[in-house]
Amino acid sequence: MAYFKLVNFNGIAPQVSPRLLGEGLGQTANNTDLDRGVLTPITSNSTIATLNAQARAGLYRYDFGGQVYNLEFTNAVNVQPGPVADDAFDRLYWTGAGFPQMGSSTQLLASGSGAYPRSFFRLGIPAPTSAASTSITSGTDDGTQTQYSTSYVYTFVSAFGEEGPPSPASTVLTKVDGQTVTISGMDTATSKSNTNLANKRIYRSNTGSNTTNFQFVKEVSLATASTTDNLNNDALAEIIPSTYWIAPPDDDTSTYPNGQMLGLTAMANGIFAGFSGKRICFSEPFLPHAWPVAYRITLEEEIVSIAMAGQVLFIATKGTPYIAAGTDPQSMSVVRMEAAQACLNKESLVDMGDLAIYASPDGLVGASGNEITVLTAGLITPKQWQAQFYPSTIKGFLWQGKYIGQYYTGSAYGAFMFDPRGGKNAFTTISSLATGHAQGGFTDPDDNELYLIDYDSGGGNAQVELFQGSTTNTTQTFKTSQFVLPRP
């Protein structure tokens, strides 16, 4: 009498014939947790919050004052906490919700009703458009003092102390120490919406033996259109630091025809990265409002998404991927990788820690350092991948070291779990990632849990579900390989 002894249970490998599957591999492994090598069902999700609308695709859990607030967005967003340690304002920065945005706890959690964030500001400080007018209004030149040819610029400064690029320079005038200059005609507002401007800083040119620099004169309120300067030349303070600190690409289509910056990502040394069209952009270190043009690099292909992959920035495109590496935005190097693995969906790209994973036409691709690998090769053929997992629709999430993917067939949603650490239990399927389907989600680094936005097809508001947050088991299915026995 024939019998079978099944000791280990592992994942699936559709590429391999059911008769040739290795020990423990199955034809089906659905809703099952195989980390311990035994059949254990995954549990259902638990609902932990209700959002303020049905259509929600972005979520960020903001911990403030010992309480967690769900920040919700209509679109998929990239949210980053500020790079400054112990930030007194508890600022967040994000892209994907229109022009790049930011806010402190005061804006995010403002009193009132409705969804968080309650308010926000535009990321970046605009330059004043009007040059100041200047004239000498007191003091005389008796011909015995050194004359200086000088002009003035001024900058806008936010309530957070962020400084923007300068105005056009005023007409040059000639003065000597002891004379007072009246500076007038300065802008008291900007045409940009959602700004947080509070003050202006005024600088005066000072010509040395080799160069001419603008040096600090004074700071005045935003509402001040006219002021005076009677500083002697040797009393001028620091050189203007913000000459090239322009805002990131925004909704000004005349300047940025490829659209606003997307994909906000935190790199080492306080540098932020983002992209617009084919252009990858970097911020000044620890100054996320400052994005000099000199720190922007144009690639050959349109960028789809970006993520950290170990110590380098991985740049997924519609064709060949790239990596960017460096510790200073002035010296970033960008290298095109030798792998034609396009990213089919920006939401499939996930930072897994040591590597980034995304959906390509051939399977799940992993990028780490300067290496790129089709991780599902040997498990799923490219043809099976396209036919069964619809990679152009995949939304990816990180959960406890595993890649969780949801796809859409055109009529139904499905999901899978992939462990990039490999092994025979690397790939399993999930019947449904959320009660309805996941519109988006957020992996909270504080607890390593995955929070999903569940869509209510009945018209109700979206809900936040904790992945496998309940104690109720799902129905698991495991189908073994085919066993072929000799005729009796």
Regions found by a protein language model. Give the residues of each.
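Surface loop/turn motifs at the tips and blade-to-blade linkers of beta-strand repeat domains
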Residues: 220-221, 255-256, 295-299, 336-342, ...
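Beta-sheet repeat architectures centered on beta-propellers
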Residues: 1-97, 149, 159, 174-180, ...
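Short loop/turn segments that connect beta-strands within beta-propeller blades
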Residues: 286-288, 326-329, 369-371, 420-422
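Short beta-strand motif characteristic of blades in beta-propeller domains
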Residues: 93-94, 266-267, 271-275, 313-317, ...
